[in-house]
């Protein structure tokens, strides 16, 4: 395949054009008065969103050289979203400013690699300062503030704060499309896994179609149970205690299932049978989680334990079990607290060590089940288009909140970035080009606050100067209410992790673009013209 190449200023100019096209589409969404972008879809209604990464992902430019620039800035938004879950628009604004200012100086003859060194020095100093000024999140009110600012909606902020309070910072909070126009929160306490009863004959509450047991024993095994003889000795021991019980096994079928159902209908046994959750190695780990949570032992031949020889002390216990057609919930397992804490610590370590996003997600789900429970935010709206828009907001707010809890919060509205300028002014540069790199970062740090104010329809320069000259690190401008305030006290905050990640990723991609000298891409193929269609020959003239 033949290639086309462009060099030096021409290459950088093409990339800059692509960067600007993407960034200009994204940055209008920044701040409380930012606007929306409508994304056309080949099928169905268009998507209306103010989520930076969602907009960036949709943009592909016709010119291949311009598209390279756009795709690199898209990478800034995607990486920031992957790490921090929010701050994608801020990252894009920072990247555009760093690239534009850097290219001006390189075109004027500055050394690109020395500028890069200056940018790296300045960004490292700014990030250290962000970490220093970060304030730890201590209460539900501060959690609500983070979520409210991210979503530009106090109702969503309060809902996420409620969810986090109920399931803890490690708990699973999922966002789903609701069935009404109201946004609601459902919390499932205890451990829940996605396996329902093996037969509807186990149901005890016919109105809700749920099977409920109080203070039951729990048999946990990785075996497939088909013969009643395998579990009969253990059942006789349980019957003597007068307690109800649940069986969690790979499968319960044939004679064993029929006998359990028959005895349940007759009232001889209070029993529920469910299949074990997960598959393969993950199933083994989940059964072990259930065993530790309930104080039981997984009955498996791998450890030399057999069902027909099992004793009562191998069984788990819980205060309550609720099983419906699709899910099983174990409430208040009676496991040893120290063992549960050790298991939690082990899973946390695995989360840190794993490099697979899928494995990390599954480990976090397991952690949440052990720690506290699962909260579901059901997003409600009048139309499907509005629901999708609102769902993006809730997901961003949830990610921002988690980031805030993790690394603390800083003054929002672009103020934290602006205030780090004082640290950058003290950096010693090796030469004039490195100093230029530091000055490029100094100017870029004003980008987000300028954009927020411009999107609110105001003149940015006056506001930026006033905020910059104040010695109070929390002093800033509330663009929503058009007034100067203490940003922390006013609840206008950003997660430190989001601010830090946005700056790191913007600087990383900007440095790559600034040190680029050649662009190589395929020569676009010209599609052949279709030959003219057949038809009648021309009629003779008379």
From Swiss-Prot:
Binding site for ATP: 29-32, 86-90, 413, 494
GO annotation, cellular component aspect: cytoplasm
Gene Ontology molecular-function annotations: ATP binding; ATP-dependent protein folding chaperone; isomerase activity; unfolded protein binding
Transferase found in the keyword field: no
Keyword Acyltransferase set for record: no
UniProt keyword annotations, A-Z: ATP-binding, Chaperone, Cytoplasm, Isomerase, Nucleotide-binding
Catalytic activity, reaction form: ATP + H2O + a folded polypeptide = ADP + phosphate + an unfolded polypeptide
EC number: 5.6.1.7
Function per UniProt: Together with its co-chaperonin GroES, plays an essential role in assisting protein folding. The GroEL-GroES system forms a nano-cage that allows encapsulation of the non-native substrate proteins and provides a physical environment optimized to promote and accelerate protein folding.
Protein name, entry field: Chaperonin GroEL
Organism (species): Endomicrobium trichonymphae
């Amino acid at each position: 395949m033949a290639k086309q190449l462009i060099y030096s200023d021409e290459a950088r100019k093409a990339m800059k054009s692509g960067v600007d096209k993407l960034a200009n589409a994204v940055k209008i969404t920044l701040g409380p008065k930012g606007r929306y972008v409508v994304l056309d879809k080949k099928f169905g209604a268009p998507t209306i969103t103010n989520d930076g990464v969602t907009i960036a992902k949709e943009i592909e430019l016709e010119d291949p050289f311009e598209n390279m620039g756009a795709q690199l800035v898209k990478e800034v938004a995607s990486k920031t979203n992957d790490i921090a879950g929010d701050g994608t628009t801020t990252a894009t604004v920072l990247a555009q400013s760093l690239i534009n200012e850097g290219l001006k100086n390189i075109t004027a003859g500055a050394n690109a690699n020395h500028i890069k060194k200056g940018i790296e020095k300045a960004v490292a100093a700014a990030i250290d300062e962000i970490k220093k000024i970060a304030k730890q999140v201590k209460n539900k009110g501060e959690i609500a503030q983070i979520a409210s600012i991210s979503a530009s909606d106090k109702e969503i902020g309060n809902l996420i704060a409620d969810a986090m309070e109920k399931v803890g910072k490690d708990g699973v909070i999922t966002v789903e499309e609701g069935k009404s126009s109201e946004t609601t929160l459902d919390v499932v306490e205890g451990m829940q896994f996605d396996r329902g009863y093996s037969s509807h004959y186990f149901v005890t509450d016919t109105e809700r179609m749920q099977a409920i047991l109080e203070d039951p024993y729990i048999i946990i095994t990785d075996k497939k149970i088909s013969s009643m003889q395998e579990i009969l000795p253990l059942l006789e021991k349980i019957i003597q205690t007068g307690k109800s019980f649940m069986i969690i096994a790979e499968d319960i079928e044939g004679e064993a299932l029929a006998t359990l159902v028959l005895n349940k209908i007759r009232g001889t046994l209070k029993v529920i049978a469910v299949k074990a959750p997960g598959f393969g190695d993950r199933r083994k780990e989940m059964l072990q989680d259930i065993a530790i949570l309930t104080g039981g032992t997984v009955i498996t031949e791998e450890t030399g334990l057999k069902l027909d020889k099992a004793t009562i002390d191998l069984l788990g216990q819980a205060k309550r079990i609720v099983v419906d057609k699709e899910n099983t919930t174990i409430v208040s397992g009676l496991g040893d607290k120290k063992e549960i804490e050790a298991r939690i610590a082990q899973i946390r370590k695995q989360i840190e060590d794993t490099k697979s996003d899928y494995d990390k997600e599954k480990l976090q789900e397991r952690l949440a089940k052990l720690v506290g429970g699962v909260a579901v935010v059901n997003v409600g709206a009048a139309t499907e288009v509005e629901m999708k828009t609102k769902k993006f907001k809730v997901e961003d707010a949830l990610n921002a909140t988690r980031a805030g809890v993790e690394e603390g919060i800083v003054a929002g509205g672009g103020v934290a970035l602006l205030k780090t300028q004082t640290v950058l002014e003290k950096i010693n540069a090796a030469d004039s080009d490195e100093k230029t790199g530091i000055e490029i970062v100094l100017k870029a740090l004003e980008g987000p606050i300028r954009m927020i104010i411009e999107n609110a329809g105001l003149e940015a320069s006056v506001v930026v100067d006033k905020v910059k000259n104040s010695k109070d690190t929390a002093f800033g401008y509330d663009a929503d209410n058009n007034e100067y305030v203490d940003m922390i006290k006013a609840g206008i905050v950003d997660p430190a992790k989001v601010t830090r990640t946005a700056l790191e990723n913007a600087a990383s991609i900007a440095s790559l673009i600034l040190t680029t000298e050649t662009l190589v891409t395929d020569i676009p193929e010209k599609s052949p013209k279709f030959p003219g269609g057949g038809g009648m020959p021309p009629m003779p003239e008379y």
